[in-house]
Amino acid sequence: MSIAIIGAGNVGMALGQALVARGESVIFGVPDPGKYREAVARLGSKASIGATAAAVGAGEVVILAVPYAAAQGVARSVADWGQKILVDATNPLAPALAGLSLGTTTSGAEQVAAAAHGARVVKAFNTTGAENMADSGYSGGRIFMPVCGDDADARSKIVALVSSLGFDGVDAGPLAAARYL
């Protein structure tokens, strides 16, 4: 499977490292590919980097790993997602990490879905830190990772992907459940 990761910060790089270690091909999409070229090259031959639009075009699954403030803009920047699975790994954190910037009547994932025309949006990878994404192994067992989205097939594929990375992937139901993740 070809996976695009939009963003090359802590979360994006940790997920990329874990995915490449599992044999997946990963293309990172960022506004300035030159800035991250060396870091991506260290991940090996299965990792590459390009502009955001090129990465979205190349990925069967696209993981959104940018700050929440940029998420809707990235989602809107693609005219038609063409039924690609868009995994929202963001958290709508308030300034100074003082809680969430949204209440319980909507979620960041629902807002991303509204901005991402034609995407099958799934929420995942937002309930643990980047250090756990790079290495999900614990002596006490697997880390619980809820996955929610309105498209059952997309949810199923991402539960399988999450599980392949060593997490205990769990189908958490429709995208509205992201309000509580």
Give names to the regions the model predicted.
Residues 1-2, 85, 144:
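Residues that mark the start of a beta-strand
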Residues 114-121, 139-178:
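Internal alpha-helical scaffold of NAD(P)-dependent oxidoreductase catalytic cores
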Residues 1-42:
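NAD(P)+-binding Rossmann beta1-loop-alpha1 motif at the extreme N-terminus of oxidoreductases
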Residues 90-137:
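Rossmann-fold NAD(P)-binding glycine/threonine-rich loop
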Residues 44-96:
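Rossmann-like NAD(P)-binding element
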Residues 26-28, 86, 171:
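Short beta-strand "acidic-cap" motif of Rossmann-like dinucleotide-binding folds
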